[in-house]
Amino acid sequence: MIRGEPQEFRDMDNNDLAAMVKAVGNRFGYEDATASYSPMNEFKVKWTRTYKWISLDISDYLDDAPEDVMECLLTTIFRRIAGEDSVEYGQPLVDWLRSEGFVRSKQSLFVRRFRGLSLSTEGKHRDLTDSYRRLIDKGLVEEDPLTYIGWAIYPSTKIVGKTSAIMKVIAISEVLDSEAVSEDVLDYCLYSQLARVKLGFNPGPKRRGIEYDALLDKYPDRRVMDRKLECMNMHI
């Protein structure tokens, strides 16, 4: 498994962002529109607004995004604020977030900010690399050297894992690092999170439960695995 090495990030250019958000904001009727990049654990945009004034707080994972990508992001955000709840992000942004270059340049920073994520696949009793290899050997997943897999050191006792599909980072609950948990169950739990990575960034607000469920159905004896997790008071 390849893990991203720390990358050098240029200083955030809030001046360029301010000029762009002002122009886009004016198109949507805002007399005063401001924005800045901020360090965030997740990829997201927050805003505060009144009738004619708006201020955006944008994740610094976007601080080096090309102009067309930021134009796409801002236009979509303003459209959603205006009530177009179903509008999807445009292709320039989607392509950029799904690119190998984005993951390579941002993943290590994301991992450093991810509280409770182990720096190794090796646990006390299980090694997630072994689980990943079994899934590959069975043809259930394709190997992706960009995917980062670790243990959630401070895990929920009920959820098997947490995943960032954008950053390709998977944290498996440390509760599953036990000899009492079968390899099949552990493999299924890892598969469930790899399925989220496979779906990738969701460009729209609509949930993709049907697509996700279809991927889970490809796992042999999925219903048996679900029942075993229920007996452990855990779920996907």
Language-model segments: which ranges?
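Active-site-proximal or metal-binding-adjacent scaffold patches in catalytic folds
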Residues: 1-187, 197-236
